[in-house]
């Protein structure tokens, strides 16, 4: 519940910090054989992420955004809503984890302007999420060199909370593009040989030293899940920062300008988004048996709907078949009801799955090819929807 500057000094007028331990901010190297595979889900309360790009505890998954898109609002919303999904043995179903004290958030902002810093501080304090958030703020007018140590201080804090205190920690780093620019600036000052677009040749290695500090360790209860946010200059996904980040991390969540221009919030485009570890975070015992099938069917139908929409622009609506019109109806409702979500509208994973079934019922059973008959029998009829 404290606020620090980019060097780790408190700036919230609170009492001085009494250190329990002094740790190297570069992190101690972890024996690869001691790492365990990320499992179980961190619930963000946002349908497009929870249902279609589920985040496992211990995963690293970046948000690819761009200037003028609401990535800060989405980050603040995740901080407000994020939590664990826990099994309730008695009912045989899952519920949101009641043990909130077992979940913590470390938020590091690098190179942000004063307005953004105030937005995060005010949002966390007003909505009661500050008590589980540790906030590090490196402002745009702070020294460049400080920007390079801010994420490392944040991750050292997260490692202590995860591996010494047994907490499941979500680390949000924004904006990694500012970090990469700081790295380029320092590299140029040291007169090192520049690489692609002036960034240093070791930027891949340097980014890996940050991203690879996510994960779980055998014999320790806690986990570190990372969500780095980066703004792509000129919406260019081939820019070195998003390009190298994509190689290191386990998927990406793509914030789309076209959806944003159509007033859809959060403007998450599910088609280029991907969570590589989703399969180990969902399913019976972790979320719900139908989760993977529903996600596959939503992806398939949304992709077909996009194709039909493009075809309609060429041949006109009169030339479309009745089946095509169903896909168009699904496309419209999917974006208006499933993707669109209020900034303070939290949906748990079961509400999101039920909403997905409501949309899939637009189609007759025969068109739902990705869902096994057994699952359809249980969930397709309206009465079966719990």
Swiss-Prot record:
Entry's Gene Ontology BP terms: vacuolar acidification
Keyword Transport on entry: yes
Pfam families per the UniProt record, alphabetical: ATP-synt_ab (PF00006), ATP-synt_VA_C (PF22919)
Keyword Ligase: no
GO cellular component: proton-transporting V-type ATPase, V1 domain
Role this protein plays: Non-catalytic subunit of the peripheral V1 complex of vacuolar ATPase. V-ATPase is responsible for acidifying a variety of intracellular compartments in eukaryotic cells.
Family: Belongs to the ATPase alpha/beta chains family.
Name of the protein in its database record: V-type proton ATPase subunit B 2
Species name: Gossypium hirsutum (Upland cotton)
């Amino acid at each position: 519940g404290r606020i620090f500057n980019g060097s780790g000094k408190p700036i919230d007028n609170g009492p001085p910090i009494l250190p329990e331990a002094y740790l190297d901010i570069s992190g101690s190297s972890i024996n690869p054989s001691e790492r365990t595979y990320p499992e179980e889900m961190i619930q963000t309360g946002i349908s497009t992420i929870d249902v279609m790009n589920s985040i496992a505890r211990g995963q690293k998954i970046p948000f690819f955004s761009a200037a003028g898109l609401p990535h800060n609002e989405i980050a603040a919303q995740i901080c407000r809503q994020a939590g664990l999904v826990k099994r309730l043995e008695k009912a045989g179903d899952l519920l949101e984890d009641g043990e909130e004290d077992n979940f913590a958030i470390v938020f590091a902002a690098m190179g942000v302007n004063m307005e953004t810093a105030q937005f995060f501080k005010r949002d966390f304090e007003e909505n009661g999420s500050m008590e589980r958030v540790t906030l590090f703020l490196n402002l745009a007018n702070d020294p460049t060199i400080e920007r390079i140590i801010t994420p490392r201080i944040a991750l050292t804090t997260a490692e202590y909370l995860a591996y010494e205190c047994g907490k499941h920690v979500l680390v949000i780093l924004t904006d990694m593009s500012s970090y990469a620019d700081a790295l380029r600036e320092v590299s140029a000052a040291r007169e090192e040989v520049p690489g692609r677009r002036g960034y240093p040749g070791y930027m891949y290695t340097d980014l890996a030293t940050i991203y690879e500090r996510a994960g779980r360790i055998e014999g320790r209860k806690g986990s570190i899940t990372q969500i780095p946010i980066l703004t792509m200059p000129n919406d260019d996904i081939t820019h070195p920062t998003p390009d190298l980040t994509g190689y290191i991390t386990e998927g990406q969540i793509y914030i789309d300008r076209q959806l944003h221009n159509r007033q859809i919030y959060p403007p998450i485009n599910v088609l280029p988004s991907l969570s590589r570890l989703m399969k180990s975070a969902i399913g019976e015992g972790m979320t719900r048996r139908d989760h993977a099938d529903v996600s596959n069917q939503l992806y398939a139908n949304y992709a077909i709907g996009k194709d039909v929409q493009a075809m309609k622009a060429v041949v006109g609506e009169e030339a479309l078949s009745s089946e095509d019109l169903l896909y168009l109806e699904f496309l419209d409702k999917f974006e208006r009801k499933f993707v669109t979500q209020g900034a303070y509208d939290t949906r748990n994973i079961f509400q999101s799955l039920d909403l997905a079934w409501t949309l899939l019922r637009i189609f007759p059973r025969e068109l739902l090819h990705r869902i096994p008959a057994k699952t359809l029998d249980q969930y397709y009829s309206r009465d079966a929807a719990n």
